[in-house]
Amino acid sequence: MGFTLAIVGRPNVGKSTLFNRLVGRKLALVDDLPGVTRDRRIHDAKLYDLKFQVIDTAGLEEAANDSLEARMRAQTEAAISEADAVLFVIDAKAGITPADSTFAEAVRRSGKPVVLVANKAEARGSEAGMYDAFQLGLGEPCPISAEHGQGMPDLRDAIVELLGEERVFAEERQEEAADEVFTPAAVGALVGDDIEDPDAEEIPAYDATKPLRIAIVGRPNAGKSTLINTMLGEDRLLTGPEAGITRDSISADWEWHGRKIKLFDTAGMRRKARVQEKLEKLSVADGLRAIRFAEVVIIVLDATIPFEKQDLQIADLIIREGRAPVIAFNKWDLIEDRQMVLADLYEKTARLLPQVRGLRAVPISGERGQGIDKLMENVVKTHEIWNRRISTGRLNRWLEGVIAHQPPPAVSGRRLKVKYMTQVKTRPPGFVVSCSRPDAMPQSYVRYLINGLRETFDMPGVPIRLSLRTSDNPFAGRAKKKK
């Protein structure tokens, strides 16, 4: 194995659950009681193309030297010294505790490279915990759900970025491993990589050379496989008039204008009531995993019968999963009055999918290869917006102007005070607003802020997350401390 990772953190944040997921089986005891793991376990692990050793440690405890907890802490310190890097796990649902801060300082003192892992990120309210995590001084939190397997692609990317490709691939760089990097059957994804500290002066430019993961979804027989075959220039996938020919998610490597792309053709996604065969149920589940693993999702609609109820359900699922959607109106070669039909389709897109204003939609013919370049141009632009980060200074200057022009309404005779705003993640863009009474803030005003963000910072066509919290500005006074 090329390198070793130690999983550390206070008790009951999900370290052993993450360990079990990385090793592929339940080797570590998992329970809700703190301190279940009393010693460290070392095992071979794999995360897509990364092969390494992982150490599961006892939860860090503050304790007297002669106690069991002290010996558990000694085991953890030994694991840190043996490891090449540390996965420091916090509970995003519970937020940051004094114990997290104490042991984050201990990990920093070790000098080992650290990935801050925000576990239980699928839980409601976890955005606030990720917001608090900045105060640990361990960098941008990588949100995951170890229990459900969400966020694993982002964790993989964070490890590679931390240690460098030469280090992580020093011993093994085989073709089979490369092919397994993006196997959708083992994947569930949330959000978050390529993110800088909110206090950073410079925002990193979009990397147009980075490989791109695209899932192609739609109702059965919408032309998904035909589109991929045209892109690849070969009959890689079985196509035909029968709905449901593609039974599973099939991946293919492609290049567009020199950029490497992994394409996923998913099984046609039917309504649940019509998914009867066990094999087809598995195929649809595989398609859902492919969506979660993708960065951009191309929704293929049959232009002759667009916006069926199931089309809207698929689009809503993609938006809720936080992926970057682009619509392809396929079979455009069958449309006669194209200008009138296209205007009607654009109007329906805006009206039927109001969750994401400015959703990009392109007419194509997968069979004839028409509109593919235009489609890909929109895919790349949407991906860039999905990865966008806005500096804290710009956000708060904008917020001041918004409040001056249109302050939040009074609730029960009391004004709501909006104090501060920061971006806590990208992929999709996620923001937290600090205010006096989050529970009292009308959802109409939250939507007003989201729409303002989208318009002011040019973010059409991607989901935007915005949550409210009561805590004070965590970055206030930081500049004074540096003096």
UniProtKB/Swiss-Prot annotation:
GO biological process terms held by the UniProt record: ribosome biogenesis
Chain ranges of the KH-like domain: 388-472
InterPro entries in the cross-refs: G_ENGA, GTP-bd, GTPase_Der, KH_dom-like, KH_dom-like_a/b, P-loop_NTPase, Small_GTP-bd
SUPFAM superfamilies attached to this UniProt entry: P-loop containing nucleoside triphosphate hydrolases
Annotated positions binding GTP 1: 9-16, 56-60, 119-122
GO molecular function terms listed in the Swiss-Prot or TrEMBL record: GTP binding
Residue ranges of coiled coil: none
Keyword Repeat part of the UniProt annotation: yes
Subunit (UniProt): Associates with the 50S ribosomal subunit.
PANTHER family, sorted: GTPASE DER
Role according to the record: GTPase that plays an essential role in the late steps of ribosome biogenesis.
Protein name: GTPase Der
Protein's organism: Brucella canis (strain ATCC 23365 / NCTC 10854 / RM-666)
